[in-house]
From Swiss-Prot:
Its cofactor is Mg(2+). It comes from Staphylococcus aureus (strain NCTC 8325 / PS 47). It comes from the Bacteria. Pathway: Metabolic intermediate metabolism; pimeloyl-CoA biosynthesis; pimeloyl-CoA from pimelate: step 1/1. This is 6-carboxyhexanoate--CoA ligase. It catalyses: heptanedioate + ATP + CoA = 6-carboxyhexanoyl-CoA + AMP + diphosphate. Catalyzes the transformation of pimelate into pimeloyl-CoA with concomitant hydrolysis of ATP to AMP. Its EC number is 6.2.1.14. GO terms for molecular function: 6-carboxyhexanoate-CoA ligase activity; ATP binding; magnesium ion binding.
C-alpha cells in the first residue's frame, strides 16, 4: 500500500489538497486525478504543486466512518452544545474561520474556553495517511463528501475530542459540516456567502487530551476509514 498526497498553492496561499492510500496498481490513475484537481481548481491556478508517494511500512488502523445524519435544518449552536462545546469556544472557532488567514490544517481549541491549544500557526494540524473504503460499493457519495467524511472520522476517533467544525475555503462551495462521535456527521448548508475564500477546520477537545499523542495519530498513523450503511 502507498500513501499519495497532493498540495497546491499560489504565492504560498493554499489552493487545494488531496490524499489517499492505495495499492500499487492504482498509483498512476490517482496521481492523474490529484494533478487535475490541483491544477484546475476554482480557487485559482497554482504556481506550486507537490505530489508525494510513500510506501506504507506499518499496520493500517481501521476506523469506522461516522454516520451521516440527513437534516436540512441542522443548527450549529444546538449541535455544538449537545457535544459539550461552549458558546465561547464556538465563537472563537468562527473567528478563526472568518479571519483572512488561510490555514492549511486544523486548529485545535479547548471546547470550554476556546483557547488555541496547538502551536502550529498558519500550518495547523493535518489529518493525513488515510484512505476511504465504501464496503457496500454503492457509490452514493461523491468525492467531496467521502474526503470530508474520512477526515471527520479520523479526527473524531479519540475519546477526548468533542467535535469538529469545517467550512470549505472553496469559492463557490457554501456547505460545511459539524461532526462528532456522539452525534455523527451533519452537513451545514449556506454556512458562508458564495464567492468567499474564508473557511477552516476547528477541532474542539477536552483540556486533558494528550495533544502530542493525538497529533501523532492524525499526522503519522496510517488509517483506513470504513463506510458501511445498514
Amino acid at each position: 500500500m502507498y500513501s499519495i498526497k497532493m498540495r497546491s498553492s499560489n504565492q504560498d496561499v493554499h489552493i487545494s489538497g488531496a490524499e489517499t492510500i492505495c495499492e500499487f496498481d492504482k498509483i498512476e490513475q490517482t496521481v492523474q486525478r490529484f494533478y487535475n484537481k490541483g491544477f484546475f481548481h476554482e480557487n485559482g491556478q497554482p504556481d506550486f504543486l507537490n505530489i508525494k508517494i510513500q510506501k506504507i511500512m506499518e499496520p493500517i488502523q481501521q476506523i469506522k466512518a461516522l454516520q451521516i445524519i440527513e437534516d436540512d435544518k441542522a443548527n450549529l449552536q444546538h449541535l455544538t452544545q449537545e457535544c459539550g462545546v461552549t458558546e465561547q469556544a464556538l465563537n472563537q472557532g468562527m473567528t478563526y474561520i472568518k479571519n483572512e488567514t488561510v490555514y492549511t490544517g486544523a486548529i485545535i481549541l479547548s471546547a470550554i474556553s476556546g483557547k488555541r491549544l496547538d502551536s502550529f500557526g498558519q500550518r495547523g494540524i493535518r489529518a493525513t495517511h488515510f484512505s476511504f473504503e465504501d464496503i457496500n460499493n454503492k457509490g452514493d457519495l461523491n468525492e467531496r463528501v467521502t474526503d470530508a467524511l474520512a477526515i471527520a472520522s479520523c479526527i473524531n476517533a479519540h475519546p477526548y475530542v468533542k467535535g469538529e467544525l469545517c467550512v470549505s475555503d472553496d469559492l463557490t462551495y457554501t456547505t460545511g459540516y459539524f461532526a462528532a462521535a456522539k452525534i455523527g456527521y451533519h452537513r451545514l448548508f449556506d454556512i458562508k456567502p458564495v464567492n468567499t475564500r474564508y473557511g477552516g477546520r476547528i477541532i474542539f477537545v477536552d483540556d486533558c487530551i494528550d495533544l502530542n499523542h493525538y497529533i501523532s495519530f492524525l499526522e503519522s498513523t496510517p488509517k483506513q476509514v470504513v463506510y458501511e450503511t445498514v
